[in-house]
Amino acid sequence: LSSFVGREREQADIAQRLQSNRLVTLTGPGGSGKTRLALRVAEAMIASYPDGVWLAELTPLSDPALILPTIAAVFGVREMAGRTLLDGLLRHLRDRQTLLVLDNCEHLIEASAQLIETLLRGAPRLRVLATSREPLGHFFLYQ
């Protein structure tokens, strides 16, 4: 692997922004290092999230309806009788101090933004670090 040099200031800035913003989106063109930067930040912040740092990779998804099951699977949440998958995921996340890294949201931007907003509303200790070639709406962007 090549070394990751020269982005320490960006890493520190993003980590600081995650302390005061529940969603930070890294935007930029393909190949600009968004994913690698997000993973470095997440790795550096593991101690800040006692319930874990989790990665959901959206690249292989073509159907927006698959975002929720993909994220739920990352956390080991399954649909159960009497409750929806979303309810189960929110119940799982509600009291957990967790960082979710959502990688490559750009091709499912609307559905990603809507689900992130729902998760943040229902899980007050959740933080999301997203990567996308396009902004995820009105949330904080880091370019």
Predicted segments, located by residue:
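Phenylalanine-focused residue identity feature
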Residues: F4, I71, F75, F139-F140
